[in-house]
């Protein structure tokens, strides 16, 4: 097959490309330039998609003996990922930009261009597994549960999965680093990228304020209605947040306060004790079924509401064009705007049943 290997400049995508070459595919490497000012993104080990990363990807491609190109996706990344991220926070929701990037950039824009150029598949360094059931590709958790990325891939369609390759799905991260060293890849010891790539200093509040400005509002006690303080914008908060609330007076019972809800129109941020954070019901919208199989009535499953952690047994069913999910135990810090992913536990790796965006919780 003709395979386009997306090479970020990290160890995972380099080894994934190497395995595609070793499997006998005709492989071409590509690095996506996602910023109009890539030289300003790096701060220490944070960030990604910088000029330095582009050079690392090119060096890896040279060692593998494959052609290498840099494609400019900065404008589309800004429109599809950054502007969506800012808009969601302005609306009081908590988006996952990595999920949006996979859906709109790596497996929509990139895959479209790859298909137009005659490639059969796109290969990435994601930790996830693909198998085939009844002729349909299905997405599963990776062998390395600590590195599993099926959550941020769960919005892909069956058609997109059918043109995708995840060569690292059955490997542990330690094995990937060892293999990179054995192949002579300089990125073998390169630190993993963390945080949001377009906010390299990790200060999401400052970034959002630079885009949205200050929109003052009140911090209100959810139980008493008492005004506890003021803030500069609901975009500086997320449900479940404890630190950085800017409340000087301690709670009467001495317990920590958490963000319970955000009201973007009035600018009110309601806070309270952890007792009020537990969620047992989720209403979700825009469901996606990667295996093309919509739920048939109430379905036992495991749900995940964050990229790492936040899982619970649940019963989910299709309702009013979306999903209605009842959790077997309460989950904390479940915020509108997050993705909820449904899994079916299986020995060969938990299977992704579907995903949707959280609209409301109770």
Curated annotation (Swiss-Prot):
Q: Name one GO molecular function term.
A: ATP binding
> Pfam family of this protein, just one?
tRNA_Me_trans
Residues at the active site: 101 (nucleophile), 197 (cysteine persulfide intermediate)
Q: Where in the cell is it found?
A: Cytoplasm
CDD domains for the chain: MnmA_TRMU-like (cd01998)
Please report any disulfide bonds recorded for this protein chain, giving both cysteine positions.
101-197
Q: At what residues does the UniProt record annotate the site feature described as Interaction with tRNA?
A: 126, 338
Which of UniProt's keywords are assigned here? ATP-binding, Cytoplasm, Disulfide bond, Nucleotide-binding, RNA-binding, Transferase, tRNA processing, tRNA-binding
For the biological process aspect of GO, one term held by this record is: tRNA wobble position uridine thiolation
Any one cellular-component term (Gene Ontology): cytoplasm
Q: Which InterPro entries match?
A: MnmA-like, MnmA-like_C, MnmA-like_central, MnmA-like_central_sf, Rossmann-like_a/b/a_fold
Residue numbers binding ATP: 6-13, 32, 125
Q: What is its EC number?
A: 2.8.1.13
- The principal location of this protein is cytoplasm
Q: Where does this protein come from, organism-wise?
A: Saccharopolyspora erythraea (strain ATCC 11635 / DSM 40517 / JCM 4748 / NBRC 13426 / NCIMB 8594 / NRRL 2338)
Q: Region Interaction with tRNA: which residues?
A: 147-149
Name of the molecule in the record: tRNA-specific 2-thiouridylase MnmA
The record's family statement is: Belongs to the MnmA/TRMU family.
